[in-house]
């Protein structure tokens, strides 16, 4: 089996899994979704471990088990942001390393806050997704695998709109000329791209600082940097963006903000310039890097280093997923301004 054939089989399996998960979530009564639980992917529990998440996980695992059997290749599923893994199928030879976030944004569909018997508090904004990323078969140790080794990625929109204004279910596939990103719909597949605009002052930036305040994982100064970054980005008169957006559950917003179509007679481009994330986690990075690259974008850390060469063993970092090289350079300059001036200047 060629790499292209294998990658296609993997992407198709992930699309089927994501769409079945979407159906499961919408079919489950809201009052049943939020029961606290533990699962293979979330063995420690926590506010993101809910009954709906565990049920969706079972769906995803079943699809991965069938995929491993059909390909005759083992799958090593990353757990706990790469600190552990769960083997699926064969245990010998090269294996596919995979990441699966069955509901990116669990609390949006399962409820947030103290539980009550007669009510559930949902976000109701539709902003969640099922996300997957896969390497081609490899024997490399987990810690040495680079983000760019994840050649296949799929993000399935949790609430696709009836009248699509943006690419919804998206996938990245490897190719001889590099990755390519596609929208998958009932009408077939279409290439999707980031914007060609280089005018940051006419584009939106999504700034995610949620994890800058995570005391277990943040770096010293992340909290202050996040405030300074907002000040640097929102100032559209001196090199900032047109405006700054925020959405919890980044992967559901990736296609909505960054991707559009380049089809005659008129290209429909996104107004999104970039995602800027302080202290991003691996389950978000692994699908985002190939999807952004395949659409013509650029993914770097806050020091300008390409994310594609970053190894799993290096863990979290702060990132920029930019529409193009020019936008990336402008945003790196904003990062430097935030670092040098501090939050209140």
Predicted regions and their residues:
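N-terminal subdomain of lithium-sensitive/metallo-dependent phosphomonoesterases centered on the IMPase/IPPase/PAP
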Residues: 1-104, 109-112, 333, 340-345
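Alpha-helix capping and helix-coil boundary motifs
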Residues: 2-5, 9, 44, 48, ...
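An extended, acidic
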Residues: 14, 21, 25, 154-161, ...
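Short, conserved micro-motifs enriched in small and acidic residues
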Residues: 47-55, 124, 248-251, 282-286
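Solvent-exposed alpha-helices and their adjacent loops that cap or buttress functional pockets
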Residues: 88-92, 122-124, 143-146, 196-199, ...
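DPxDG-like acidic metal-binding loop motif
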Residues: 91-176
């Amino acid at each position: 089996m060629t790499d292209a054939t294998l990658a296609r089989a993997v992407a198709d399996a992930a699309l089927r899994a994501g769409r079945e998960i979407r159906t499961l979530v919408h079919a489950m009564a809201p009052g049943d979704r939020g029961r606290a639980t533990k699962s293979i992917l979330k063995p420690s529990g926590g506010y993101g471990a809910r009954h709906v998440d565990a049920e969706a996980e079972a769906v995803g695992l079943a699809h991965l088990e069938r995929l491993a059997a059909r390909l005759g290749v083992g799958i090593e599923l990353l757990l706990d942001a790469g600190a552990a893994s769960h083997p699926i199928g064969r245990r010998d030879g090269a294996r596919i390393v995979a990441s699966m976030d069955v509901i990116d944004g669990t609390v949006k569909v399962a409820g947030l806050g103290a539980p009550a018997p007669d009510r559930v508090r949902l976000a109701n904004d539709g902003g969640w997704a099922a996300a997957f990323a896969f390497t081609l078969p490899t024997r490399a140790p987990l810690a040495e695998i680079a983000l760019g080794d994840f050649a296949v990625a799929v993000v399935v929109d949790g609430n696709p709109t009836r009248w699509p204004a943006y690419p919804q279910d998206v996938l990245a596939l490897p190719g001889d000329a590099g990755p390519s990103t596609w929208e998958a719909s009932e009408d077939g597949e279409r290439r999707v791209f980031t914007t060609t605009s280089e005018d940051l002052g006419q584009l939106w930036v999504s700034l995610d600082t949620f994890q800058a305040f995570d005391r277990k994982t943040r770096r010293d100064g992340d909290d202050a940097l996040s405030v300074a970054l907002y000040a640097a980005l929102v100032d559209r008169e001196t090199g900032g963006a047109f405006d700054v957006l925020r959405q919890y559950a980044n992967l559901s917003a990736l296609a909505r903000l960054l991707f559009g179509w380049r089809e005659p007679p008129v290209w429909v481009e996104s107004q999104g310039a970039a995602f800027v994330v302080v202290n991003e986690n691996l389950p978000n990075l692994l699908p985002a890097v190939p999807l952004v690259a395949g659409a013509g974008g650029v993914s770097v850390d806050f020091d300008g280093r390409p994310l594609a060469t970053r190894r799993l063993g290096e863990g979290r970092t702060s990132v920029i997923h930019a529409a193009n090289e020019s936008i990336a350079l402008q945003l790196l300059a904003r990062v430097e301004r935030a670092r040098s001036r501090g939050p209140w200047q």
